[in-house]
Amino acid sequence: MPQKRWNDHLMSRRAVLRHGANGLLAGAALWALPSVAWGRQAWERLDETRAIVDGRTPTGRGITLDLPSVSEDGASVRLTVSVDSPMSSDDYVEAIHLYALGNPSPPIATFRLTPRAGKAEITTRVRLNESQTVVALAEMSDGSVRVAEQRPRVTVSGCLIREETYGNGSDDTLPEPRVRMPRRLAAGEPGEIITLLNHPMETGLREDADGETIPQRIIERFRAELDGETVIDAELARSLAADPYIRFYFRAEEEGELYLLWQEDSGATAESRQSVSPG
């Protein structure tokens, strides 16, 4: 090959390599952009979550969603969501919505809060049918929305048709809730409370030994009041684990009574009344 043609060939080859490398770098930079830049956040795939956002632009700041990165059994996976907020009368979290996008029924729960909560943090246990994305949306009193997403891996499915996924609650009555009050409660400071109810949380998605569908039977509502004022009002759904468990906070200024109500979709209820004595 003549020298000039050889030089032209080398220059063309170098240009191709250079442009190719630049293209790869540009592609890598695009893939490194957060999902919001692509409009591919998981919450956008579900009608219910899009309806909550309702045209607003969610932010990922000020909200944390915590689940184990790997769960050996998806039948009962611990989940904690917390939102940065003073929980004052003019600046508080109005609602926290939880969804498991890979479940046959994605809604987990909606927790509606008031400033009486004192701290916007909820812990519960959920069923995860498979490795999937879990979404938390927080609606704030100023009209803004915050979003957090996690993708836990499940090694054994919490499939909602597995018998061992369900608890052993009575068929006709609700047991007395178990409640753990804070050991020490300072006036005006958030106090942690944990409550649990033994209940199968039947989803209506599995069959009995005769092949008949077992009717849905779930706890659909939880409510906590302090001296008649709402602390938290929760709508619970089929993706909540059996024997539902809720950890939350309340703030008391003086002695009073904390009232807890669990309500089944049959209308049956279980109640607990706890004395509150801030130190």
Predicted region positions:
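Short amphipathic, basic-aromatic surface patches that mediate peripheral association
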Residues: 83-87, 197-213
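N-terminal edge beta-strand
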Residues: 52-72, 170-186
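Extracellular Ig-like/FN3 beta-sandwich strand-entry sites
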Residues: 129-133, 253-257
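N-terminal secretory signal peptides
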Residues: 1-15, 22, 26-30
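C-terminal segment of N-terminal export signals and the immediately downstream linker at the start
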Residues: 31-62
